[in-house]
Amino acid sequence: MRSAQVYRWQIPMDAGVVLRDRRLKTRDGLYVCLREGEREGWGEISPLPGFSQETWEEAQSVLLAWVNNWLAGDCELLQMPSIAFGVSCALAELADTLPQAANYRAAPLCNGDPDDLILKLADMPGEKVAKVKVGLYEAVRDGMVVNLLLEAIPDLHLRLDANRAWTPLKGQQFAKYVNPDYRHRIAFLEEPCKTRDDSRAFARETGIAIAWDESLREPDFAFVAEEGVRAVVIKPTLTGSLEKVREQVQAAHALRLTAVISSSIESSLGLTQLARIAAWLTPDTIPGLDTLDLMQAQQVRRWPGSTLPVVEVDALERLL
């Protein structure tokens, strides 16, 4: 006997969260809970404003139609990435094919303060990895901040994310202020320039390795080994089903590229599932999941160690 619930939710964000020049005041999304006999599976559907093609309102109508079809015994594939991902997680939990083991190590997001980062890294076992957003301020400032962090913490490796913010000139201005002796400790810089060709040129000219992120979701992207490209950053909410995520990870690993499972600012429920996916598909890589503290609450499932209050399922708005 099948049953299902769909919930709508909204979480207040911290004041300083900006996505593509838009301030994100709340994180909005949906949960689906599928039950069959004694088994249960949850999934999160939370399109990311400015990045997802679909809105959560569009996702809601498609999800409700899919759930009603599932209750009637149908299980067609979904095209919208956020729904395909959330539904595939719920189905995987229902079938017990999403392993429980999780990688809760997260590369902490750094605001540029080395003292703050040293405190965050003090309890981090093994490799010291942190992430810095660049491209929000002047490229010269970004270069100075990155250089300061690498100088202050000798065993630090940084992941940088520019979100295609730089022209070739700005990329050169950034690199000019990063000591060439430190550049090998930049694990990768995600999408430094507005075009892939400019990003490739940046890697060649600076010796700083790059990673593809947005490029993975473009129709002409192909997995090929390229000089200067070290990693791919996979955001499942923007990618699609678990099967598609696994295919991308396998394609990256076949080329000896690092594959990083990364957050699209999901709620704690979605983040705990991403931690399980990371442990399953990329067990040797620290995922990019340090986004929970951008929110003012957790929901349904707790992230280990978080002190944020937890909103239980009874407090959510039920749609079905």
UniProtKB/Swiss-Prot annotation:
It catalyses: (1R,6R)-6-hydroxy-2-succinyl-cyclohexa-2,4-diene-1-carboxylate = 2-succinylbenzoate + H2O. InterPro entries: Enolase-like_C_sf, Enolase-like_N, Enolase_C-like, Mandelate_racemase_C, OSB_synthase_MenC1, OSBS_N. GO terms for molecular function: magnesium ion binding; O-succinylbenzoate synthase activity. It is an enzyme of class 4 (lyase). Pfam families: MenC_N (PF21508), MR_MLE_C (PF13378). GO terms for biological process: menaquinone biosynthetic process. Keywords: Lyase, Magnesium, Menaquinone biosynthesis, Metal-binding. Belongs to the mandelate racemase/muconate lactonizing enzyme family. MenC type 1 subfamily. Converts 2-succinyl-6-hydroxy-2,4-cyclohexadiene-1-carboxylate (SHCHC) to 2-succinylbenzoate (OSB). This is o-succinylbenzoate synthase. It comes from Shigella boydii serotype 4 (strain Sb227). The lineage of its organism: Bacteria, Pseudomonadati, Pseudomonadota, Gammaproteobacteria, Enterobacterales.
